[in-house]
Amino acid sequence: MKYELHSTPDFNKWFNRLKDATVRQKGLARLARVENGNFGDYKQLAADLFELRFFFGGGLRIYYTIRGGLVVLLLVGGDKSTQVADIEKAGTILLKSGKQKGVIDHEHISF
């Protein structure tokens, strides 16, 4: 199954600030696999909130939701040290989007 990836400005800001080029490349490779339906290691945190788990880069995490069965919306990212705050932020973004359809400013990304 092929997914269309979209990202929020919060996610883009975080991802663009990753300093380690190897971590960024591995992250991009993982997102390319997600786009092709291979999510790898992930955890469902709530009915519509998921966490991609990485075992490099300080325990990198990407929080996402799936819309319409075909669109993966990348909400925020972080690592183990910011996990609690990142989950709260992702939940807030989802709540806002649920109350006001189309409120999430996002852009389509492809690999």
Over which residues does each language-model region extend?
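PIN/NYN-family metal-dependent endoribonuclease catalytic core
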Residues: 8
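A short, compositionally biased N-terminal segment around positions ~18-40 that is enriched
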Residues: 19-33
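A short, surface-exposed loop/turn module that caps and links secondary-structure elements
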Residues: 29-56, 104-111
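Enriched for short, Lys/Arg-rich terminal
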Residues: 1-5, 13, 21-24, 39, ...
